[in-house]
């Protein structure tokens, strides 16, 4: 009986340890919630050259297509939906971006 109690206790402890190891929370980078801007170069009314990129939108709940000029450096601008979602919401990345890359 003592052996059974000891084994049951060890099993519970081991189970709790595995739960803590597997439950590491994802911490979204702060730049995922920053406004992306438009990438205009100084003196431009609008970007002369712009490309379709992706930016994470907290209010939308995922990444959205975004026109980005060639100037400025911004971390919340990604070349593909999958790279945007993998960085900012990895749990939903593959299903959210299905067909967009």
UniProtKB/Swiss-Prot annotation:
Source organism superkingdom: Eukaryota
Annotated glycan sites: 53, 73, 92
All copies of domain BPTI/Kunitz inhibitor, residue ranges: 32-88
Main location: secreted
Expressed in which tissues: Expressed in female salivary gland and ovary.
Signal peptide start and end residues: 1-23
Compartments where found: Secreted
Gene3D superfamilies in UniProt: Pancreatic trypsin inhibitor Kunitz domain (4.10.410.10)
Disruption phenotype: RNAi-mediated knockdown results in decreased feeding efficiency of the ticks.
Database matches in InterPro entries: Kunitz_BPTI (IPR002223), Kunitz_BPTI_sf (IPR036880)
Disulfide bonds, paired cysteine numbers: 32-88, 41-71, 63-84
Keywords: Blood coagulation cascade inhibiting toxin, Disulfide bond, Glycoprotein, Hemostasis impairing toxin, Secreted, Signal, Toxin
One of the record's GO cellular component terms: extracellular region
Any GO MF annotation of the entry: serine-type endopeptidase inhibitor activity
Stated role: Anticoagulant protein that modulates blood feeding of ticks on vertebrate species. Delays normal clotting of host plasma.
Stated name of the protein: Kunitz-type anticoagulant protein HA11
Source organism of this protein record: Hyalomma asiaticum (Tick)
């Amino acid at each position: 009986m003592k052996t059974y109690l000891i084994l049951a206790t060890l099993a519970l402890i081991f189970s709790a340890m595995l739960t803590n190891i597997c439950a590491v929370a994802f911490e979204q980078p702060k730049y995922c919630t920053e406004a992306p801007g438009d990438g205009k170069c100084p003196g431009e009314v609008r970007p002369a050259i712009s490309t379709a990129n992706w930016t994470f939108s907290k209010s939308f709940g995922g990444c959205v297509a975004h026109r980005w000029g060639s100037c400025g450096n911004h971390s919340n601008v990604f070349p593909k939906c999958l790279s945007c979602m993998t960085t900012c919401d990895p749990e939903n990345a593959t299903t959210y971006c299905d067909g967009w890359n």
